[in-house]
Amino acid sequence: MKIAITQRVVDYKNGPYDALDHGFYSMFQGHELIPIPNQLKFFRTNTVTDSDLIVFSGGNSMIQDDWQFNYERLVVEKHVLDLSMAYEKKILGISRGTQFLTVSLGGNIVPKDGHMTDHTVNAQGARVTVRSRHKEVLGSIPAGADVLAKDDDGNIESWKLKNIGCVLWHPERMKSHWMPDDICWHK
């Protein structure tokens, strides 16, 4: 399976660079992982059209006044989402990728103190400890989406809408890489 994946932008001494969490290589072991550059001039349409799954990864912020916000990444991801939807690709959102997909498809995110932690979600009759590294929760999800997991405070942590599945946590940073079965398209 070919999996195209967005990357976080990290600012370092000599300028920005794209980065991908090492956990994705073990999470998607046995599949071809294709990183998507955060510059439209280097993006190739066939990165999406030739892929079986498009992953919108975590990292950076969706909040424009946050120092970790990156406009160039947002532009690339909007383009990738438009192509993915046009070609009816399977889509997986992880953490910030879930926030991006939620907002892009009509939902919203809201600030939440104390959410940058490991915490428990309830999904498919199981209680699973997951890892979150953001300061926001989902205020609402896209119309027609099904809730797959909630935390103990009742916040939605995972949803699915047709061929789009999202988790608000970081499965790539968990030993089990756990996600609800309904959206484990790479297995």
Give the label of every model feature segment.
Residues 1-96, 103, 110, 115-127, ...:
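N-terminal beta1-alpha1 cap of cysteine-dependent amidohydrolase-like domains
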Residues 129-130, 165-170:
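Active-site-proximal beta-strand elements of phosphoester/diester hydrolases
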